[in-house]
Amino acid sequence: MQIPPFSLEAQISEIGQEIEEALLRVFRSGKYIGGEEVATFEKAFASVTETSYSVSCNSGTDALILALRSLNIGKGDEVITSSFSFFATAEAITSVGARPVFVDLSLIHI
């Protein structure tokens, strides 16, 4: 049996036209970072999550860097992180000047 790892079929059948129109607006505007569409998304996301603000990021790495900076983590700090993660986790930590400290995961220690 082969199970596809990811499928957007359900979303496309429901809101495909809306997604295509939004993508075309972004492509035509040339504003891939920032711009009206991003501001609209951030405002809607803040509303859905019942927060005052929302900041979107272009990647998980940038999101981690932003989170670390918001906590004033930097040079001289150590950040404990899982050794069972994508390399971008450690990259984000070193990008702010901190040192990643890797821990192993074990069911008997949880």
Language model feature labels by segment:
Residues 61, 83-84:
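Alpha-helix N-cap/helix-start capping motif
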Residues 84-103:
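A short helix-loop-beta submotif of the ANL/AMP-binding
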Residues 108-110:
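Conserved small/polar residues in nucleotide/adenosyl-binding loops
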Residues 1-70, 74, 96:
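Conserved PLP-binding active-site segment in aminotransferase class I/II-type PLP enzymes
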